UniProtKB/Swiss-Prot annotation:
The gene is carB. It comes from Bacillus cereus (strain B4264). ATP 1 binds at R129, R169, G175, G176, K208, I210, E215, G241, V242, H243, Q284, E298. Pathway: Amino-acid biosynthesis; L-arginine biosynthesis; carbamoyl phosphate from bicarbonate: step 1/1; Pyrimidine metabolism; UMP biosynthesis via de novo pathway; (S)-dihydroorotate from bicarbonate: step 1/3. Its EC number is 6.3.4.16, 6.3.5.5. Its cofactor is Mg(2+); Mn(2+). Mg(2+) 2 binds at E298, N300. Residues 547-929 are annotated as: Carbamoyl phosphate synthetic domain. This is Carbamoyl phosphate synthase large chain. Keywords: Amino-acid biosynthesis, Arginine biosynthesis, ATP-binding, Ligase, Magnesium, Manganese, Metal-binding, Nucleotide-binding, Pyrimidine biosynthesis, Repeat.
């Protein structure tokens, strides 16, 4: 059936900010979909609240709205634009839930808008646990024994009948939010309560636990003609019981017999047909390892994380084709863009193995519960490709950016058998490493299988790796052993340590012996047809398929997996850089390993290498391609950290030189540069021992800011208020020695300002200055940023511009730089300079219309700013106000403290824009998920140091009609100021207390500031966690609270009695 001609305008709904469970994969799918629809000649309108994406670039759609994804704002856009149809299935769970809400509100009928792709009835049938279960029964498809529940009593009824353990799956939620496995009554109460709270329809499915079965996924496509194909099937190495987003996954499945494969394939196709899904769909199944009994777990009637993985694993662009199917095209009409010869109805075939390993945020949140279950905790993932599973797995391990080069972790070597058993049974983020350690220590595969039901095939592969380690150690210098180790994916780093040589020596040894990898193409058809994709992976085999052209080329290093501190913003910069390289006439080559992102879409660059970002893997590509140079500025800290080693190998670093990069990163050199330029900075020194640290802190005076040098996202950064906290930090957070010094700075309580600039060495151009709402001390990534600055005097602005220009020239920056200033007592100090793209680049690029990464890349390639139409100075400010608000994923990470400080905790960001600061703030806060009711109750419990400041805030809350609740200490201070307050019991009280109020939803806001430094102030911690678990906005910064008050005050009509008004007037007359 040809494409539909009865519709012209399509509204695409994006997925909003990055949170755990919904990351960069929707930037990739949304971008593909918009381009795909434009190719077909439709007018595309996009709404999304996330400014950090390629998707929200003005070029992606005909009209782009960066607005909150709420019923209020999306309805407004529909009424204004009057689209013929909406396409929600590419916006993740957010998009689906929005479609359901829009349909129920009546706005789609009112405006005559239809839902494209998967129909509303199919979405509801797949997402509503009750409807789905009924459909499976009609199809005779087995599901685990289960019960739909709406309250705790119903849950007890089911458990009494079936027994523990049971799995709780909330309806219409993302990444298993609120769900989990219950082994006893205590867990049942906690998880069911949380699940019902997180489900927008207050519904959970309780099912008998089938943990231990194999978890298999099928990624399926269907069109309106009922053509249906399997794009890819995948197998979780972790059995059922761990969320698929937290599982290590391989494609294609490795342990299924042909009969099992066909049986599950037929089931998947039968389900997608019964649901009537048009587009992409993900089916999750459980298979009993000892029989042919299987169960259907769930269906995602949309493009998902798994479909991004399947697209990158096969080269088959699911989202692009799903968009074409949505407008009526069929699979047998669409040409496969990879082969450009076959049609999209050919099922992809793989002649390699793909591994995906999740990237968790536990390096940031040491206190988080690391146990994995049905609620997802990973922020991102890496993917790798190899010719055998061992190679594929080891490449994925070294892609994780955790400083790991092999399937072993030093700290696990001390574990005894009992501890290993416990951790393997319970499953945490290190389980695969513990399995390898257990095998090293002689535990049998049979025992491990008994503990965790991981398939023998996978255990055998881990054992093969361990056996090879022994071979490597026993045969130092043996070239045959080296060859086999390399074919299994062993890194030079590991072999060098085993052979007591340097990594470079092993690399050179292989080069002399012609032991270098070749590059194979990902072509969707196992080389059956000729293919046009420039998409490659390395392996040790015979024929090299990556043909080097005679064009001049430039390599861009990507930023690896999405994690806190290094999000999709860096991918945005990478993609823009690649486009600029192509515009400048060079061949653009990208190296990256994140399957979720736009940068790893093979249509973006001239060549894509899907490889780990380690010196060895990058050098293999550079040796083959011999580029003009490498750009490291856009890949975050990942790429910057490779610069020195690349230069040692004789590779040219384009842009800011290594020496100048080091001058901005190395404390002493940076101080010297600032002194020379006459730019002030907070007093600070470097310590290489604990004693030195104590002495420096005494000399500077507390509070001090402590951090290791060379970090991203404020990792292990803290503000400490006294000596015992400093000693606690030195002992627990960092291992200080001469190579890893600790920086100690005077902590200045001032206004923080952030600037992004582009320098060509002569000229420095400043697209924008941003002011942070939270004072210095809250990480810039967790602060609310405002552009243009609202409270900076012209004099201070000029100081900031002068310092920025001086730093750009003085540090010889070529390309981008990001500077953080603090304004303290009317004086501007520099906190830090990052000689690279920062996380604010996409935000400022969109607002100012200056494509910063693009301009910077052209500067790096030799085209100065004046040639590009920019000069030195500050870009004229926009009239509207723009707010960048952080988004957190605390609900997914139990036992993480939500207090904001110098260590970054947010996973994503949203933008609000309007004519006034209050309106822009309102949009930003609402888009970030904070509910802003105009009346209600606010609980105030603040540290003594904040009491005075909190009084003014409490008074303003009272004036707009809020009830104030406080514990005795804070209440007394309020009463002294004649502010009405209701005293509530502290949390250790047996009676009705503060936590009960939060649990019962009787408070709209909780204001809670951290008492003293970091030693766990348990009460405060429990208050903050309880707020998160119950969806109550918990404000840990008084600056954020003030921002919310501004919004509330602007929404509230003032109500003063006539007497008050006349008294004021009389007062004025007297003065006249």
């Amino acid at each position: 059936m040809p494409k539909r001609l009865d519709i012209n305008t399509i509204l695409v709904i994006g997925s909003g900010p990055i949170v755990i469970g919904q990351a960069a994969e929707f930037d990739y799918s949304g971008t593909q979909a918009c381009q795909s629809l434009k190719e077909e000649g439709y007018k595309v309108i996009l709404v999304n609240s996330n400014p950090a994406t390629i998707m929200t670039d003005t070029a992606t759609a005909d009209k782009v709205y960066i607005e909150p994804l709420t019923l209020e704002f999306v309805s407004r856009i529909i009424r204004k634009e009057r689209p013929d149809a909406i396409l929600p299935t590419l916006g993740g769970q957010t998009g689906l839930n929005m479609a359901v809400e829009l349909a129920k509100s009546g706005v789609l009928d009112e405006c005559g808008v239809e839902i494209l792709g998967t129909k509303l009835s199919a979405i509801e049938q797949a997402e509503d646990r009750d409807l789905f279960r009924t459909l499976m029964q009609d199809l005779n498809e087995p599901t685990p024994p289960s019960e739909i529940i709406h309250n705790l009593d119903e849950a007890y009824g089911f458990v009494n009948e079936i027994g523990y353990p049971v799995i709780v799956r909330p309806a219409f939620t993302l990444g298993g939010t609120g769900g989990g496995i219950c082994h006893n009554e205590e867990e049942l109460i906690e998880i069911v309560t949380s699940g019902l709270k997180h489900s927008p329809v207050t519904q959970c499915l309780l099912e008998k636990s089938i943990a231990g079965c194999k978890e298999i996924e099928y990624e399926v496509m269907r069109d309106s003609n009922d053509n249906a194909i399997v794009v890819c099937n995948m197998e979780n190495i972790d059995p059922v019981g761990v969320h698929t987003g937290d599982s290590i996954v391989v494609a294609p499945s490795q342990t299924l017999s042909d009969r099992e494969y066909q049986m599950l394939r037929n089931t998947s196709l039968r389900i997608i047909r019964a649901l009537g899904i048009e587009g992409g769909c993900n089916v999750q199944l459980a298979l009993d390892p000892y029989s042919f009994q299987y169960y259907v777990i769930e269906v995602n009637p949309r493009v998902s994380r798994s479909s991004a993985l399947a697209s990158k694993a096969t080269g088959y662009p699911i989202a692009k084709l799903a968009a074409k199917i949505a407008v009526g095209l069929t699979l047998d009409e669409i040409v496969n863009p990879v082969t450009q010869k076959t049609y999209a109805c050919f099922e992809p075939a793989l002649d390699y193995v793909v591994s995906k390993i999740p990237r968790w945020p536990f390096d940031k949140f040491e206190s988080a519960n690391r146990t994995l279950g049905t609620q997802m905790k990973a922020t991102g993932e890496v993917m790798s490709i190899g010719r055998n599973l061992e190679e594929s797995l080891l490449k994925a391990v070294r892609s994780l950016e955790l400083g790991i080069y092999h399937l072993e972790l030093d700290h696990l070597k001390e574990l005894d058998k009992e501890t290993m058993k416990k951790r393997i049974i319970k499953a945490d983020d290190e389980r695969l490493f513990i399995v390898a350690e257990a095998i090293r220590q002689g535990v049998t595969k049979e025992e491990i299988n008994e503990w965790c039901e991981m398939d023998f095939f996978f255990l055998q592969k881990v054992e093969n790796i361990v056996n090879m380690e022994r071979e490597v150690k026993a045969n130092v210098g043996n070239m045959e052993v080296l060859q086999i180790a390399k074919e299994m994916g062993f890194s030079d780093h590991y072999i060098a340590a085993a052979w007591n040589k340097t990594e470079r020596e092993i690399y050179d040894m292989r080069k002399e012996n012609n032991m270098m990898p070749v590059f194979k193409m990902v072509d969707t058809c196992a080389a059956e047809f000729e293919s046009a994709t420039p998409y490659y992976y390395s392996t040790y085999a015979d024929e090299n398929e990556s043909i080097v052209t005679d064009r001049k080329s430039v390599v861009v290093l990507g930023s690896g997996p999405i994690r806190i501190g290094q999000g999709v913003e860096f991918d945005y910069a990478t993609v823009h850089s690649v486009w600029a390289i192509k515009e400048a006439g060079y061949e653009a080559i990208i190296i990256n390993n994140n399957p979720e992102t736009v940068s790893t879409d093979f249509s973006i660059s001239d060549k894509l290498y899907f490889e780990p970002l380690t010196i060895e893997d990058v050098m293999h590509i550079i040796d083959l391609e011999k580029p003009e140079g490498v750009i490291v500025q856009f890949g975050g800290q990942t790429a910057i950290n490779l610069a020195a080693k690349l230069e040692e190998h004789g590779v040219k670093i384009l842009g800011t030189s290594l020496e100048d990069l080091d001058r901005a990163e190395d404390r002493d050199k940076f101080e010297a540069a600032l002194t020379k330029l006459g730019i002030p900075q907070p007093v600070g020194k470097t310590a290489t021992t604990v004693e030195q640290a104590v002495a420096i802190a005494e000399e500077i005076g507390y509070p001090v800011l402590v951090r290791p040098s060379y970090v991203l996202g404020g990792r292990a950064m803290e503000i400490v208020y006294r000596q015992e906290e400093l000693l606690h930090y030195m002992k627990n957070a960092v291992k200080v020695h001469a190579d890893h010094p600790v920086l100690i700075d005077r902590y200045m309580v001032g206004k923080e300002i952030e600037v992004d600039a582009i320098s060509d060495g002569e000229n420095v151009f400043i697209p924008g200055i941003m002011e942070h709402i939270e004072r210095a001390g809250v990480h810039s990534g967790d602060s609310i940023g405002v552009y243009p600055p609202q409270s900076l005097s012209e004099k201070l602005k000029e100081q900031i511009i002068e310092h920025t220009i001086a730093l750009g020239k003085g540090l010889n920056i070529v390309g981008l730089l990001n500077i953080q200033f603090v304004v303290f007592k009317d004086q501007v100090y520099v906190i830090e300079v990052n000689p690279r793209a920062s996380r604010t680049v996409p935000f400022l690029s969109k607002i100012t219309g200056v494509p910063m990464a693009n301009v910077a890349t052209k500067v790096i390639l030799g085209q100065d700013l004046v040639e590009q139409g920019y000069g030195t100075g500050y870009h004229p400010e926009e009239k509207e106000v723009y707010v960048k608000a952080p988004v957190f994923s605390f609900a997914k990470l139990r036992s993480v403290d939500t207090t904001l400080g110098p260590e970054m905790k947010s996973t994503g960001e949203v933008m609000g824009k309007d004519l006034t600061l209050e309106k822009a703030l309102y949009k930003g806060l609402v888009a970030s998920g904070i509910n802003i009711p105009t009346h209600g109750s606010v609980i105030i419990t603040v540290a003594d140091k904040d009491k005075e400041e909190a009084m003014e805030i409490a008074k303003r809350f009272h004036e707009i009609g809020y009830n104030l609740l406080a514990t005795a200490g804070t209440a007394q201070s309020l009463e002294e100021q004649n502010i009405p307050v209701q005293v509530v019991n502290k949390i250790d009280s047996e009676d009705y207390n503060l936590l009960d109020i939060i649990r019962q939803g009787k408070a709209q806001f909780v204001i809670n500031t951290l008492t003293k430094g970091k030693q766990p102030a348990r009460d405060g911690f429990r208050i903050r966690r309880e707020s998160v678990e119950n969806g109550v906005a918990c404000l840990t910064s008084l600056d954020t609270t003030r921002a919310i008050l501004r919004v509330l005050e602007s929404m509230t009509f003032s109500a003063h009695s006539m007497k008050e008004i006349t008294q004021t007037k009389r007062h004025e007359v007297v003065h006249a």
